[in-house]
A protein has these predicted regions:
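Conserved catalytic core of the tyrosine transesterase superfamily
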Residues: 1-352
């Protein structure tokens, strides 16, 4: 199915997973997911389904009325029986619980926030269609989200990381040396691309050979929600991509169905998000022990550097593919404060 394009294949895969999960729900739940389809991606709907699966599990485990019911026997009218206190109990349950396999699960404030958002959307669907009158989710306050400090690499750490990827195999021996040399150009291209454009790891994984346009020094990416966008790159990214494509990628015969993929695994298949996440984490640990670096942190590093150079929050939002500039502003608010502090020292009222 690779010929359909990576993103279409992923959408089909998520749709099939969603259908399997929906088989565990009461029939009326399928109406909700049908209603979501025009405005959401398959990945989003699958996430909602997993969230609701936890909610129904909670009802069976902790609610006296639902504990004697099979999940498939629940009807839409049963949703009205719950009150705000039940929803609050659910949020408390989410902090730490044992799943159906006995595994301990936890949620931080962001996980709880998302699951309440999913539940509100679920209730709102039936409320708008007048299938229920009582909606207890709207009177429960959303958990407060504390601002997270932006973790990013300093300029010297960026240089050290790229040097490690490009020259770090000198002291390796045996199979480690062979593996390093075989993948060095690919890995350097990935790190340089992430640090030099700020694209998401999912966008990186989804790149095909034909998406690289050296004539205009840009790549075509598929953003969240399936929107196509062009991202421009500079000389360093161009060199890393050219070296990888000309000296490595063109000489690899990809497995059937993966011929179009830009970045291939050692098995000659399209690299996965997890593979790149592990590669970034393992390499970054050798450069900085006190920062947990992920591909998203490389994206934050690029966004920070771009904002420092331009001071243009709208440009940063556009380049990073944020639909709402307030999302960007929220992430880089600390840098705004730093600029304001420096601005306060620029204007002098008396000459010294």
């Amino acid at each position: 199915m690779e010929h359909l394009s990576y993103h279409k294949h992923l959408s089909i895969e998520n749709t099939e997973k969603l259908r399997i999960v929906l088989q565990e729900f009461p029939p009326f739940v399928r109406d909700y997911f049908r209603g979501l389809e025009p405005s959401t991606t398959a990945k989003t709907r699958l996430s909602y389904a997993y969230d609701l699966k936890v909610f129904f599990y909670f009802l069976q485990q902790k609610n006296a009325y639902f504990s004697h019911k099979e999940i498939k026997d629940i009807v839409v009218g049963d949703l009205e029986l719950l009150e705000a206190v039940d929803i609050e109990e659910y949020l408390e349950f989410l902090k730490v619980y044992q799943d159906s396999n006995g595994k301990t699960r936890t949620n931080d404030e962001r996980g709880i926030h998302r699951k309440l958002s999913s539940l509100r959307s679920f209730y709102l669907y039936y409320s708008k269609r007048k299938l229920i009158k009582n909606n207890p989710t709207i009177v429960v306050d959303m958990p407060k989200l504390h601002k997270k400090q932006i973790i990013r690499l300093d300029p010297d750490e960026v240089a050290e990381l790229l040097d490690l990827v490009e020259f770090g195999g000198k002291d390796l021996t045996g199979m480690k040396k062979v593996y390093y040399e075989k993948n060095k150009l690919r890995n350097l291209a990935i790190f340089t691309l992430l640090l030099g454009t700020g694209i998401r790891v999912s966008e990186c994984v989804g790149l095909d050979m034909e998406h690289v346009d050296f004539k205009n020094n840009r790549i075509k990416v598929i953003r969240k929600g399936g929107k196509e966008d062009y991202v421009y790159f500079g000389d360093e990214v161009e060199k890393a991509l050219r070296d990888y494509i000309e000296l490595s990628r063109k000489h690899i015969q990809a497995c059937e169905g993966h011929e179009s993929a830009l970045f291939l695994s050692i098995q000659r298949k399209r690299m996965s998000v997890k593979a790149i996440e592990n590669m970034v984490s393992d390499s970054a640990k050798q450069v900085t022990m006190f920062k947990h670096i992920t591909p998203h942190k490389l994206r934050s590093t690029y966004g920070t550097n771009l904002y420092k150079e331009t001071g243009d929050i709208y440009l940063v939002a556009e380049v990073l593919g944020h639909n709402d500039v307030n999302t960007t502003r929220k992430h880089y608010a600390a840098l705004d404060e730093d600029r304001k502090r420096r601005a306060a020292k620029v204007v002098r009222m008396r000459e010294e």
